[in-house]
Amino acid sequence: MRREIGAVLVTSISFAGISPACAQCCDHILMMDDSYGDGWNGGSLQVLINGSPIGPFAATGSGSDTTFQVCNGDALELIYTPLDYENENSYMLFDQWGNIVFADGPTPATGSVYTGTGDCTQVPAPGTMPSAALPIDTSDCVLADNSLVPGTGIDPGCASYQGGDIWFALPVPSSGNVVVSTADTGGLNDTGIALWTGPDHFNLSPAGCDDDSGPGYFSLMLASELPLGDTLWIQAFGYGGGTGAFELCVTDPGTVTLESSELPIVMINTLGQTIVDDPKIDALMEIKYNGPGNLTYVTDPANVYNGHIGIEIRGASSAGYPQRPYGFETRDPLGANLNVSLLGMPSENDWVLLSNFNDRSLIRNQLASAIAEGMGQYAPRMHLCEVLIDSSYKGIYVFGEKIKRDNGRVDIATLTGSENSGDDLTGGYILTQNYWDANNSFESNYTPIDHPTFDVHFIYYYPQPDTITQPQRSYIAEYVDSLETALYSVDFADTSVGYRKHMDVKSFIDYFLVNEVSRNNDGFKKSVFFHKDKNSNGGKLKAGPVWDFDWAWKNIASCSIFEATDGSGWAHLINDCFTDNYSCGWYVRLLQDSTFNNELRCAYDDYRTNVLDTANLFAYIDSVGLLVQNAQARHFQKWPILGVSGPAPEVNACAITYAAELDTLKAWIAQRLDWLDANIPGVCSNAGMNGPEAVGSLSCFPNPSTGTFHFQGFVAGSGPLVFTIHDVAWREMDRIVLSPGQIAFDRTLVRSGTYFFTLNDGGHLLQKGKLVVL
């Protein structure tokens, strides 16, 4: 991780080789950095002492340093000569105490850039420099005051640092874990803290920086698995240069030992390597699970998986969380992909371990997937598990499926490099919206109708950017263009020539509802997926799968839409907020179609009787709470984030117990559903189900049913009787013709939900009713 010191980006602060002296002469260190890692490419820095050159010096590789002596009264001058790739070059000159004498770069100024006089007599006041850090330990809460502290100029990159930093130090405890926090004492009320580690104050490496993860605008930071034997330096300061008194506390959460769990246990052996974000490293993995209701012990044999994997850090912002998320693939001993079924999930080789560091409920991602699946959509299957990496406890993770084209996942046709014409070319494709570049995406020819200056991009997810052919790139871009042309046309609502010709409406309704019920901050701007099968398999663009809900189901201080504490706000209007990636904004146009609105309302009303029923959602949450009642204690000892906002800056005070966290989530959901009950647009008329109650003598049982209904009775009539079943969007699901008289028959529906049946005689409605499939 790179941190800014003054105007210079560095990966660490190194003063190796300095022997502090407070006499006539003292050591200075010149640290040179190259961000690309190939040295300064001809650039150089000359150092003159009393007019005599002692250089020139230049960075080699990613960086290098040199030490030289300066005496009291010496004339010191720096002269920089540029050459190629100057935007990669930076440097810093420090005195014996770590004070920055001069720093510049990237793209340093040229010529004579600094002149000064040597001074080896200045000794820093206590707390004003890493070399003069004040002592503190894990039993301490100390009163600090930075009112008279000038500041080091070492910018840690958060909390709008403008100096005024005061420094503390302590040995890294035997657990390797500390929690550092600030609190109110009636003085400074907005702080920042940065943590640094190293064997001494001449060799500091950044360990993180925090603005206001604590109560109010105070700071809280967890540092885990710090190098034993090192010293931890704490840099505390006021936001934006603020000064005053505050409390600083350091605690040791201890070491978590895992012996048994009600959850699956995942044990990863890195073979002495460090897991990085790319490429995957070869490692070994064991998965142990004795099934629901049984304890699984760390000492049990691996009964789910025992073999090779390739593993890497995954995610964007989440990759920087202390509890890192991982992506991995199961492999055979030779390193080839190995498809296996894990924890009841269909056989595949690509999997994820999602971090719960931003989700104290341990349920947000699972809940969203369960809802989407209950709506009949594919959503990644997920299981909670406890993870050990190299015998070190890492907490509760979400073990799940990576979004991928596969018959058991996103079930669309394969698309090979040789399929470039005809029906072959039409699918399957997976697109996503996320952080894009010119090589991995195409730009829409349209802009959101409510934000005409915004550019919209679609990333090639399958086939991947490095394998998709040019005809395939052109085809899917042209298909999206045809969809948008229809969507933004005058006849957009026409069922023959409008957007429905290109779009699978039900999938877009379901995607909308999952992300609006959860008011997902990311669901319409990034972590957005679409997929399309071949035309011979239907061929319309579908929304989904749903993904990434750790910023959902809560009130977030980012924009009025997500800050609302009364359950209100439309997440699909994310473009109205300051956003890091623009939404395509299609729902703004779709909601101008009264038919779409009516279908949306009918679907919502239907789901409120089953998958979105408040009692059902609460029961699901309670079931997870019961499952992890023991594991959560270990998780929150490892990651003491209860009562802490975390990466998503929450508006409300955070619950301080896990049980209270689940109650908070349930209260949020109830309030959100109340608002949606009153504000989902459209009218659900159920088409032919309106009108006076019809008279008929058919009885139906069981109802509700698990799928099969038995009808019987006597019906008089003059001609053939037509019995039909419709779903809530009034699509015909079943039709049979019956003869008048005594009737008995069975009908089966395979998908859970609400349905309606009608019995007609020559167009005259004899009977109607509702069917519920559990």
Annotate the PLM regions.
Residues 19, 692-774:
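C-terminal outer-membrane/trafficking sorting elements
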Residues 262-264, 274-275, 281, 315-317, ...:
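Middle-to-C-terminal accessory/interaction subdomains
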Residues 301-357:
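Conserved oxyanion/phosphate-binding beta-strand-loop segments in alpha/beta enzyme cores
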